[in-house]
Swiss-Prot record:
One of its GO terms (biological process) is calcium ion homeostasis. Belongs to the FAM20 family. It comes from Homo sapiens. N-glycosylated. The lineage of its organism: Eukaryota, Metazoa, Chordata, Craniata, Vertebrata. Pseudokinase that acts as an allosteric activator of the Golgi serine/threonine protein kinase FAM20C and is involved in biomineralization of teeth. Forms a complex with FAM20C and increases the ability of FAM20C to phosphorylate the proteins that form the 'matrix' that guides the deposition of the enamel minerals. Residues 49-63 have a biased composition (Low complexity). This is Pseudokinase FAM20A.
Length: 541
């Protein structure tokens, strides 16, 4: 009996010790955290940025007339040499605060004809899409005998991709003052994926060629459609080339690599130029096993995954884009960086017109197009519909200026929303063949400008502003790209090439003015009436 009592005592002591340890190490720290105000770790500016962004968003919501630029997700981590603005630590913020970037970009009240989508119709369409996805996902789980505790997807009206679609109007893909773009970039960067698949054009071409006849490394086209937990979609282009590598001089433009960092940088440049014609694009490090292989229902995509001799998980696309494993992309061992470009509204909701570029290049090894041999080619273009409308031609010239800055020779088509008619803006899609060679400036890309000798006054004013030291293009691009998770997105030679190419554009315009006169070359737009005191540079300087 005394032995049993001792055992009970030892048991009680042991239980008491365990209870005391639980109180001391688990419950008491939680009570302390509740009673003590939260302290922010030294050197962590996250809380300040979050409250600042919240205040900016609240200000924009309470006063629709107040223009608040929400382009910068974070403050730059470093201050580059020569990158400080007089009286300000940010050239990018100073640029967006300039009067040129604050002129009214649209009438105070947009009519239904000025918005791309009718909101109620779009929401009904998206609800049907979500319901259909839930049904198909349920059927797939039943067929594969899979169990899942995840609830069915719900369409959230406040989802950033929904608000992005509803915000597209005849002036651009998004407004300067819209806080939606920053939220969309953040969501694409962090939201988990729920499905992965080939793009529609790749599906249409699967098996449509004989892989033995492929004579080029066609894997450069590999891209996937990723869907996120909020039902948003993005085009994923994986890293194919290191940032410090240049396109070989013997490569034709139509077999060049598609670079994920070029897509990211093109979005930032388009925003800095105030075009707003490139869909929001962000960099992300993707786990190819968990975020692609394990969520895809496409058996063909599942079949092209393999483990390399270095134990890295790789995948490749089927013919005609890729036929061999040496053209695969590989994680390290699972992680792979790439670009994510937000999808535009479905063609069922917002039909788009794909138009051949009048300055399209010859996609043969030796041929040349008429514009390459005829310096008066633009005179012919001006007589042809729809380019006898100067606005369409001016938009093509804007596109050529953009392509020259990024070094993109592969602009064979452009797209437009049919709703906005002939005067609608051109969408600058597929920019992954830009930023290939920083050491070479392809002057032929500027042929629309040099042959037509026309430019929008608004475009010229922005270019001249970016040529000034306080707003130098390379500096604001460097600062803007620091916002991306994959920073540095561009190497320093590519950034400096932007300044060099900008000067080439301005010299081309100056030569046109000398030859034809300022009134003939510079086409006045609304910017002249809306911002007469916006600090324009001398047009002939």
């Amino acid at each position: 009996m005394p032995g049993l009592r001792r055992d009970r005592l030892l048991t009680l002591l042991l239980l008491g010790a365990l209870l005391s340890a639980d109180l001391y190490f688990h419950l008491w720290p939680q009570v302390q955290r509740q009673l003590r105000p939260r302290e922010r770790p030294r050197g962590c500016p996250c809380t300040g940025r979050a409250s600042s962004l919240a205040r900016d968003s609240a200000a924009a919501a309470s006063d629709p007339g107040t223009i608040v630029h929400n382009f910068s997700r974070t403050e730059p981590r470093t201050e580059p040499a020569g990158g400080s603005h007089s009286g300000s630590s940010s050239k990018l913020q100073a640029l967006f605060a300039h009067p040129l970037y604050n002129v009214p970009e649209e009438p105070p009240l947009l009519g239904a004809e000025d918005s791309l989508l009718a909101s109620q119709e779009a929401l009904r369409y998206y609800r049907r899409k979500v319901a259909r996805w839930n049904r198909r996902h349920k059927m797939y789980r039943e067929q594969m005998n899979l169990t899942s505790l995840d609830p069915p997807l719900q369409l959230r009206l406040e989802a950033s991709w929904v608000q992005f679609h509803l915000g597209i109007n005849r002036h651009g893909l998004y407004s300067r003052s819209s806080p939606v773009v920053s939220k969309l970039l953040q969501d694409m960067r962090h939201f988990p994926t729920i499905s992965a698949d080939y793009s529609q054009d790749e599906k249409a071409l699967l098996g449509a060629c004989d892989c033995t006849q492929i004579v080029k490394p066609s894997g450069v086209h590999l891209k996937l459609v990723l869907r996120f937990s909020d039902f948003g979609k993005a085009m994923f282009k994986p890293m194919r080339q290191q940032r410090d590598e240049e396109t070989p001089v013997d490569f034709f433009y139509f077999i060049d690599f598609q670079r994920h960092n070029a897509e990211i940088a093109a979005f930032h440049l388009d925003r800095i130029l105030d075009f707003r014609r490139v869909p929001p694009t962000v960099g992300r490090i993707v786990n190819v096993t968990k975020e692609i292989l394990e969520v895809t229902k496409n058996e063909i995509l599942q079949s092209v995954f393999f483990v390399s001799p270095a134990s890295n998980v790789c995948f490749f696309a089927k013919c005609p884009y890729m036929c061999k494993t040496e053209y695969a992309v590989c994680g390290n061992p699972h992680l792979l960086e790439g670009s994510l470009s937000a999808f535009l509204p479905s063609l069922n909701l917002a039909p788009r017109l794909s138009v051949p570029n009048p300055w399209i290049r010859s996609y043969t090894l030796a041929g040349k197009e008429e514009w390459e041999v005829n310096p008066l080619y633009c005179d012919t273009v001006k007589q042809i519909y729809p380019y006898n409308n100067s606005q369409r031609l001016l938009n093509v010239i804007d596109m050529a200026i953009f392509d020259f800055l990024i070094g993109n020779m592969d602009r064979h088509h452009y797209e437009m929303f049919t709703k906005f008619g002939d005067d609608g803006f051109l969408i600058h899609l597929d920019n992954a063949r830009g930023f290939g060679r920083h050491s070479h400036d392809e002057i032929s890309i500027l042929s629309p400008l040099s042959q037509c000798c026309m430019i929008k006054k608004k475009t010229l004013l922005h270019l001249q502003l970016l040529a000034q030291a306080d707003y130098r293009l390379s500096d604001v691009m460097r600062e803007s790209l620091l916002e991306d998770q994959l920073s540095p997105v561009l190497t320093e030679p590519h950034l400096l090439a932007l300044d060099r190419r900008l000067q080439t554009i301005l010299r081309t315009v100056e030569g046109c003015i000398v030859a034809h006169g300022q009134q003939s070359v510079i086409v006045d737009g609304p910017v002249e009436q809306l911002a007469p005191d916006s600090g324009q540079a001398n047009l002939t300087s």
